[in-house]
């Protein structure tokens, strides 16, 4: 943290067990070059982080004195216009406490300017996650900045306990020290919609927390700031537990499945410290559970195929009597023990898990910068691009939806899916349906081209195992 008792520039400096930086990758000062080996920088050139506005006058604290320092914390203090600001910086924590004393009997606005710096190389993807959020007396609310559309500010009122700005992997938050009792009357996020990103690639969002003087007991205000990663290690710390709801994968079943998947992946990583290997092992584990469903689906399709001649006879015989036709078809299904939905249900049952996996691999910071093979996949949170097309970087539609290069894993996965579809189509579907499936297969290759390589690695291995099982079942059946 550089500057005085305000945060002017802030980098995330956390070390791995081998003393390397855990979180790396930042844009340079001009926002033109992405520097992959430097620590993540989230705040740059800020003026007011945080400062006060009293009766329309900004009170900034730019001179600092070291009060005390020990093995766990550093205390800095500064005075201006009889107001004392004390800042407590803790070791091994991204939380910083800000204490203001001797405040006048006037309404106070606590201001935090500068916003956040995007941290990802694929900046368009990163920006799609930027949002402002607040916890008020009623509920947690969030507004994504992609929905600005000319709106110059977002206001959260009804007594706000904590609020902040969130990117894909990092957050900047302000929390009232006793947020169950002391709450801001409102929090306003000022956004310049025509300049959400400035020349240095900063997402410009200015946060204002409004307090009534009658709420500030003894003329003091104490808040804590958290500027750091969205991970359970830090958000589960006692002082940050209220922020843990920012770490989620969706609503209801998807959210719970996502948390279960994340727990299993991190547990496996504690045994095998390579998330690439963990993704492969995880695919085997999931196949143990979904394998019986795949077998059931295959057998159901085989039964359906076996009764096709009888179905065609019924359809020809009762083509002019819809009621009788449906009755005879259902009777045939019952007689032959065929469930018309038997081939679809196993797939539908797996859908919540697939959605949860998608959320985990796209949103979890543990995969950011995690390497599988140093000569191929060096970041499981990014596509494994093997050929770059620099001229596509600034074409937003192509860049955002299909990337600006060719990734290898989606091609491997696409080939496996094609072989699987071809094997299935030969036995179960007509040529026109097969053609549609092949076109969809090509579309999935393009779509997965922008997905994290961790997700693609899992899904590729999963599809290979699925293909091998289908091949074995087909051989047994023949």
Mark where each language-model region is:
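Helix-loop-helix
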Residues: 98-100, 112-126, 133, 158, ...
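Soluble non-transmembrane domains of integral membrane proteins
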Residues: 1-242
């Amino acid at each position: 943290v550089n500057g005085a008792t305000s945060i002017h520039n802030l980098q995330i400096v956390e070390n791995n067990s081998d003393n390397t930086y855990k979180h790396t990758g930042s844009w340079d000062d001009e926002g033109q070059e992405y520097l992959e080996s430097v620590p993540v920088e989230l705040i740059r050139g800020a003026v007011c982080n945080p400062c006060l506005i009293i009766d329309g006058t900004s009170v900034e604290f730019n001179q600092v004195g070291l009060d005390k320092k020990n093995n766990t914390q550093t205390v800095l203090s500064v005075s201006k216009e009889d107001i004392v600001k004390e800042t407590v910086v803790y070791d091994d924590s991204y939380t910083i406490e800000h204490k203001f004393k001797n405040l006048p009997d006037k309404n106070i606005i606590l201001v935090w300017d500068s916003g956040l710096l995007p941290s990802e190389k694929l900046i368009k993807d990163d920006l799609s996650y930027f949002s402002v959020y607040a916890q008020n007396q009623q509920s947690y609310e969030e507004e994504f900045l992609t929905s600005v559309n000319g709106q110059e500010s977002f206001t959260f009122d009804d007594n706000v306990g904590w609020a902040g700005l969130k990117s894909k992997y990092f957050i900047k938050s302000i929390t009232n020290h006793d947020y169950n009792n002391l709450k801001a009357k409102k929090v306003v996020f000022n956004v310049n919609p025509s300049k959400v990103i400035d020349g240095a690639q900063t997402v410009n969002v200015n946060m204002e927390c409004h307090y009534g003087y009658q709420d500030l007991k003894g003329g003091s205000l104490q808040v804590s700031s958290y500027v750091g990663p969205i991970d359970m290690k830090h958000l589960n710390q006692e002082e940050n537990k209220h922020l843990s709801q920012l770490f989620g994968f969706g609503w209801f079943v998807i959210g719970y499945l996502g948390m279960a998947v994340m727990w299993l992946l991190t547990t496996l990583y504690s045994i095998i410290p390579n998330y690439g290997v963990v993704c492969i092992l995880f695919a085997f584990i999931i196949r143990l559970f979904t394998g019986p469903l795949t077998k059931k689906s295959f057998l159901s399709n085989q039964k359906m195929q076996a009764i096709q001649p009888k179905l065609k006879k019924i359809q020809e015989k009762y083509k002019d009597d819809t009621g009788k036709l449906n009755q005879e078809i259902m009777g045939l299904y019952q007689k032959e023990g065929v469930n018309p939905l038997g081939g679809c249900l196993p797939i539908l049952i797996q859908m919540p898990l697939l959605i949860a996996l998608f959320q985990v691999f796209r949103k979890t910071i543990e995969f950011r910068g995690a390497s599988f093979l140093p000569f191929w996949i060096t970041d499981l949170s990014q596509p494994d691009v093997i050929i770059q097309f620099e001229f596509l970087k600034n074409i937003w539609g192509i860049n955002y939806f299909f990337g600006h290069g060719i990734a290898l894993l989606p091609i491997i996965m696409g080939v496996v899916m094609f072989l699987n579809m071809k094997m299935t189509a030969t036995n179960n579907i007509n040529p026109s349906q097969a053609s549609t499936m092949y076109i969809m297969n090509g579309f999935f290759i393009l779509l997965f081209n922008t997905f994290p390589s961790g997700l693609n690695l899992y899904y590729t291995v999963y599809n290979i195992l699925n293909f091998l099982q289908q091949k074995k079942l087909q051989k047994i059946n023949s």
